[in-house]
Amino acid sequence: EFVNNRKWTDATFAVNEKIDCTMTIIVNELDETNFKSEIQIQARRPVYNSSYTTTLLNFRDQQLDFEYTEGEPLDYNSNTLTSNLTATIVFYVYVILGLDFDSFAPKGGTTYIQQAQQIVNMAQSEMSWTGWKAFDSNQNRHAVATALQDNASDAFREMWYTYHRKGLDEMAANPDRGRTTIIGALPALQEVKKARPTSVLQIGRA
């Protein structure tokens, strides 16, 4: 409800254009109201003129420690972060929106990726919150935000658009052209791997 009942973008989506997203929290340790957890995020968008979906994000974040009391409402204010749990959820909402909009227009998701970065900037001031610090891990939220914005990501984001919009979305109308475009787009991943061997774009497909 926290995600579904909030408007995250000014864009209007038709029913068949909506992003299918699931976030699953895996609790590893529990001490009263303190949770040591992981969160699995999966998101898919429809492929144009088909019954298929394509994966936008399939990522396991292994650093989610938070405090939560049963029945406590989740709340988010863009100017203030009060919970590591809500901050993490909001961060991935913006990452998903960024990847979705990138798949429809070249770097079309920049605004949302920048909003995800803003969450990182704010969360870093909370010393007890895990998953936000630079150099703690090459697969945490800081790493995801950085990977989507550094110079090496340009090739990835261009590939992302070409693969989805000019490739998959063309398959119904012209399968040969769509397939050729997809094959031609994939070498860009090697560019990212060469420039940033430990990038989360390689490890976690963020």
Each model region followed by its residue ranges:
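Start-of-domain marker
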Residues: 1-36, 49
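Surface-exposed peri-terminal alpha-helical interaction modules
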Residues: 7, 16-18, 57-59, 78-84, ...
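Acidic/His-rich structured neighborhood in mature extracellular/periplasmic domains
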Residues: 31-146
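Solvent-exposed alpha-helical segments and adjacent loops
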Residues: 86-95, 99-103, 175, 179-183, ...
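Phosphate/adenylate-binding glycine loop and adjacent helical scaffold
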Residues: 115, 119, 179, 200
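Alpha-helical segments in soluble extracytoplasmic regions
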Residues: 122-194
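Conserved small/polar residues in nucleotide/adenosyl-binding loops
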Residues: 206
